[in-house]
């Protein structure tokens, strides 16, 4: 693919040195991000937690723009989980308003750059004002064919699987289904029709999945950045992509270096969890 490096880094910058090392034909088709660390970023600066969320919007904007310019097909951002309702009311209120503000401000840009906005999760249970702006974005960006932007809102990986099972049962009762397999379940997930994530980035150094895309990340490569989300920029994104390209995805098999020579019997393993 053809990429304009001038859109990805300033000439002579550290980011340019990183982006020149990327193999643009081996980028992830689907990139997922757990945007973590806003509160700790604010606390280290003596600021209220909500200021960390405001600062995090810049990282969202830059990650979306850069991913689209790189040619990544799908970007999924974990914006608000079902567990986040436990946070202070003022923090939840701020998050919802920042979401509405971001979508309003970026809507024209998303349309111009061919970005399709697709909320996932139980987002229709949010406040009516949030639902309205999301529905407007869905309609306005429906023709976007450059990148799909999934925004996970009121999202839970377990709830996603439960919702999929409920819909399957309902269709089965209506005579629409004869059997259930992995492919069937995939067709009923929030991300139906999209490839599973190739790379999951989590910021802030935490080693948790936080109930995110539990079905879809079975074979996803995971990159943990020590950076808090508000400080996550192009450099950190390029480092994660380079780390991804340095890995060999085996999907439960063995690497070429570890494969048995032709004609030699393979050793018996203790199961899929044995060895590395």
Residue map of PLM features:
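Flexible, compositionally biased loop and terminal segments
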Residues: 1-276
């Amino acid at each position: 693919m053809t990429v304009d490096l001038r859109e990805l880094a300033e000439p002579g910058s550290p980011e340019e040195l990183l982006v020149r090392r990327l193999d643009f034909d081996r980028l992830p088709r689907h990139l997922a991000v757990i945007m973590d660390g806003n509160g700790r970023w604010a606390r280290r600066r003596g600021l209220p937690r909500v200021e960390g969320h405001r600062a995090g919007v810049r990282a969202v904007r830059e990650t979306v723009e850069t991913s689209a310019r790189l040619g990544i097909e799908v970007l999924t951002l974990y914006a608000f989980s079902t567990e986040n309702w436990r946070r202070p009311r003022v923090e939840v209120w701020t998050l919802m308003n920042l979401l509405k503000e971001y979508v309003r401000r970026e809507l024209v840009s998303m349309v111009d750059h061919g970005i399709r906005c697709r909320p996932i999760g139980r987002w229709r249970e949010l406040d009516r004002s949030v639902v309205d702006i999301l529905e407007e974005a869905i309609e306005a960006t429906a023709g976007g064919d450059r990148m799909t932007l999934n925004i996970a809102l009121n999202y839970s990986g377990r709830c996603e699987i439960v919702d999929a099972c409920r819909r399957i049962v309902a269709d089965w009762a209506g005579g629409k289904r004869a059997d259930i397999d992995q492919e069937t379940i995939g067709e009923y997930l929030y991300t139906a029709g999209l490839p599973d994530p190739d790379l999951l980035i989590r910021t802030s150094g935490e080693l948790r999945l936080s109930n995110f895309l539990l079905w879809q990340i079975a074979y996803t490569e995971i990159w943990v950045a020590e950076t808090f989300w508000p400080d996550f920029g192009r450099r950190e994104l390029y480092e994660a992509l380079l780390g991804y390209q340095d890995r060999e995805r085996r999907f439960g098999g063995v690497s070429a270096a570890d494969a048995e020579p032709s004609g030699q019997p393979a050793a018996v393993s203790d199961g899929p969890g044995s060895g590395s």
